[in-house]
């Protein structure tokens, strides 16, 4: 090569290019060839020449090689020609062998095809088996799911669904049936939800229907526990706690109908059996439903629904019947429903996790408590029967104690009970007003007669009357008071008992109860009994007999008040040394009543006097008196004498005051007769007749119709009349006018105005007589004198006016 | 003071304790009834004005205690009575038997010309009756006086009883006045005398 190169005498550049062409790949020839053209303008011609030279060199070398190997080639061809013959022989042999093989192998081929078919089948079978082994568990689980759904084992069904979704479906998700299953699961879940919710609704309806029984049982337990000892209470609490324990892992798979587990008959037979709410109601629907919703991740929906429904039920339970206040059973049903409701809530609070919370139950209870208090306040105000109010108090206390035992605060209920207690006492006061009225209505207002020791002791046992003198008297004898006194005393004690009943179980101290009782008793005495007494005394048709006896009765009732104080002290078991902040004010009641009765006696007597005075039939122009006192006045005097004669049991001071009042009233009435503006003329004869009547009054006054008057005290009632009449009958004007204003005047009590009025009535008489007496000197002189005295009296009257 | 009535008649109620004297008076004067028995002590009275033949009559009716211990006091009022009602209780035979004693008391203490009347009270309690109406009537006939069964409770015959007695008193009074008139005859002086006599008679009657 080197030699060829030297002989051609090529350009070094073209040498390099040819080297590259020979060494590089075909793909990279382009750039190399382009470099040829990029070079000198005629470069490619020279390049072609060099290229042809390279070609001829290579051909020469090839020729040399062929010459060198020529002999070997010929030998080889000769051998090949020999082989040809051998080959032709071999070909015949192989064809024949092949033909024989073909004939012999035909059966083998047939068998082989069978084998191939079998192997394909086996492979297919294997594949199918593998696939099926993946699918079968899914189908089994789905079948199980269906079975669980049919058996209502929803929780297990949910578990199965979860396994299907998480474990089995990924293996077979490409299959159609699997898609169908996957699409069906949400529907099944919704079905489970709906069924569980339906169960829950049934449960809610059930506990609503059975709230009464639940509440009744709980309240009975609360009542029973009050009679147990402390240790027994502890024992019950432990038992109760044990019953409240729930093992969530053992939630029953079977769903029982939500019914009371104990029939009413069983209840009656086992009245003393202590039952828990779980013994009465099947709570499993709540537990199952809660778990199902938890598993489904929809716990909040369940909680919201449950709470919402229970709030609705609470409002229903808290809505009383419109006529609840009419019977104690109405209240009882109301209370038992409420207790039943909250006992269930408390149970669920303790056995579930978060379904209800303490905050939720407290909120619910506060709402309920406000409603309950409003309801009780409204309905109790309709009660007019104290026994019903008392029953309401007892029920309320049991109600409060029951719920307090479950942890609900009930202080506001006890506050309400104090309001109801005031109303209870008001109701009692009304009832006792009726009682007192009946007692007064039935009294015969005469001293109680007793004919033997037995009867005497009966009265003494009812009323604490102590009188050694009466005790020594022989039978038959009489107590000074009438039948109403022991009856009232007994009824006041009954009132105290009734008032005390309300305070039982209200958790108040004896001192507080004692004070409350005294306040109530004070109201009874100072308001109720006082009103009844005053109404009795002011009855239009009450007679002197009744009034006199009332005075005696109130005296003895007043003395008995200290025994009532002792009675209250004993009944509340407080120490005798305890200072009472409240004392009985009954004393003032009886004093006031006595004063009213006394006043009424004076009024009645004066009315009788007025009736007599209206019968007066004076002939005011008579010329000569009858010579005897007027008939009406004698009847009047005799009547008064009889009155004071028969009412010997009237207290001395009252009798004296009554007598004085009567005399003063009579005197005033007689004076009014003389001064009556409708009476125009009075004759001296009439004055003299009138004087006879006044003399009778004075005789009555001086006869001491009532013992105890000193000197002429009673006669002073008629002194004005006496001096006036003396002045006119004696015609002592010179003395009167001369001594007027002097303390020692005989006619000190004669009012000039009065004298003037009466004198003018007599002057009129004289004027009439004047016609006929023109010629009688004495009459003329008398007329002049009257005129003179009239003028002088008039000046006195005017003088008095100036001074005034 | 001007009189507000024409005549004053004084009546008296007597009889055993508890027969209903006060209740009869209460019914007549107040038209009311009180079921509770309250024993009258001593003497009491009520006034009611009625009209008879155009005249205003004031009836002053004295109610007496039936108990023995008040006999002295109540007897003092017999003399002034112009009419007396003897009351018994038809349910209490003893009170009926005692009417004879009460009549004897009247003859002893009352004016000889007093008008009388027997009343059988409580006739509403027929189921407890012990004295038949016939026996009451016979007793009254025997003494030549009027008889009525009454009931203060039901107000049966109460008005009738008092009006009957008042009318009888009025009749008797009118008869006396007529007798007095017929006795007089002649001139003005006699007329004056008659007036004086009438006035005097009237006043005596009141007394």
Swiss-Prot record, chain A:
GO terms for cellular component: cytosol; exocyst; Flemming body; growth cone; perinuclear region of cytoplasm; plasma membrane. The lineage of its organism: Eukaryota, Metazoa, Chordata, Craniata, Vertebrata. GO terms for biological process: exocytosis; Golgi to plasma membrane transport; intracellular protein transport; membrane fission; mitotic cytokinesis; vesicle docking involved in exocytosis; vesicle tethering involved in exocytosis. It holds the Pfam family Sec15_C. This is Exocyst complex component 6. Belongs to the SEC15 family. Component of the exocyst complex involved in the docking of exocytic vesicles with fusion sites on the plasma membrane. Together with RAB11A, RAB3IP, RAB8A, PARD3, PRKCI, ANXA2, CDC42 and DNMBP promotes transcytosis of PODXL to the apical membrane initiation sites (AMIS), apical surface formation and lumenogenesis. The keyword Metal-binding does not apply. The exocyst complex is composed of EXOC1, EXOC2, EXOC3, EXOC4, EXOC5, EXOC6, EXOC7 and EXOC8. Interacts with CNTRL. Interacts with RAB11A in a GTP-dependent manner. It is found in: Cytoplasm; Cytoplasm, Perinuclear region; Cell projection, Growth cone; Midbody, Midbody ring. Keywords: Cell projection, Cytoplasm, Exocytosis, Protein transport, Transport. The keyword Protein transport applies.
UniProtKB/Swiss-Prot annotation, chain B:
It comes from Homo sapiens (Human). It catalyses: GTP + H2O = GDP + phosphate + H(+). Regulated by guanine nucleotide exchange factors (GEFs) including RAB3IP/RABIN8 which promotes the exchange of bound GDP for free GTP. Regulated by GTPase activating proteins (GAPs) which increase the GTP hydrolysis activity. Inhibited by GDP dissociation inhibitors (GDIs). This is Ras-related protein Rab-8B. It is found in: Cell membrane; Cytoplasmic vesicle, Phagosome; Cytoplasmic vesicle, Phagosome membrane; Endosome membrane. Residues 205-207 form a propeptide. The lineage of its organism: Eukaryota, Metazoa, Chordata, Craniata, Vertebrata. Its EC number is 3.6.5.2. Pfam families: Ras. One of its GO terms (molecular function) is signaling receptor binding. The modification Phosphoserine is found at residue 180. Belongs to the small GTPase superfamily. Rab family. Switch 1, switch 2 and the interswitch regions are characteristic of Rab GTPases and mediate the interactions with Rab downstream effectors. The switch regions undergo conformational changes upon nucleotide binding which drives interaction with specific sets of effector proteins, with most effectors only binding to GTP-bound Rab. One of its GO terms (biological process) is antigen processing and presentation. A motif (Switch 1) lies at residues 31-45. Mg(2+) binds at residues 22, 40, 63. Its main location: membrane. A motif (Switch 2) lies at residues 63-80.
